[in-house]
Amino acid sequence: MYISKLYREEDRGKILEFLKQNEFATLVACDGEKPTASHLLMEVMEDGEQLFVNGHMSKANPLWKTFEKNAEVLVIFQGAHTYISPTWYNHVNVPTWNYQAVHVYGSPRIISDHDETYNLLEKLIERHEAGSQYRLKTLPQDFVEKEMRGIVAFQIEVTRIEANYKLSQNRDDEDYHNVIARLNERDDEMSHGVAEAMKRQRSSHSRDVTGTM
């Protein structure tokens, strides 16, 4: 994707944290004639320096059948995003939109092994049900097997990542902090999420005022 140099994020640790916090993502592939996509829970895993994205979908979803035609697929992770009013600056300007988005590219494979699929689902449930006693192994296993027959698990070996954090980095301190304050005056979670992302961004990067919009 197009990313202005000012907004390109390359810190691996920060990108991984973002991916893990925004794991409901969009998987995009091509069916041979046109793009096709699904919105899925996508879990990022590390194996040394190599990254993988694990997921599963309904067997009725035709997207998994495109994997044999796609040497590379795209997974889009989207963070908080919101409108930025030009009235928040101390000079004349135009409206814009702040957001964080990460595009992850990689080679997909279907997980056909039963035990590998079971372990993937087991770890996923353990992570999301950490505060409860609900576990895959405590369920009736005939029920689990029936449910597993209705899904297709997959893994994507990550080949490249593009991270775009457009968070008013082109603004001076006065405008930057005023944008944060105005966002926090709103009632919606998206605005508050962008405000928090801006706080983290300015604290971890030196100021860079270029006038890029």
Where are each of the predicted segments found?
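A generic structural signal for short beta-strands and their flanking turns/coil linkers
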Residues: 23, 38, 49-53, 69-73, ...
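Residue-level recognition of well-ordered beta-strand positions that form the cores
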Residues: 41, 56, 76, 107, ...
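Short, basic/aromatic recognition patches
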Residues: 2-26
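Short, structured beta-strand-loop surface elements
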Residues: 60-119
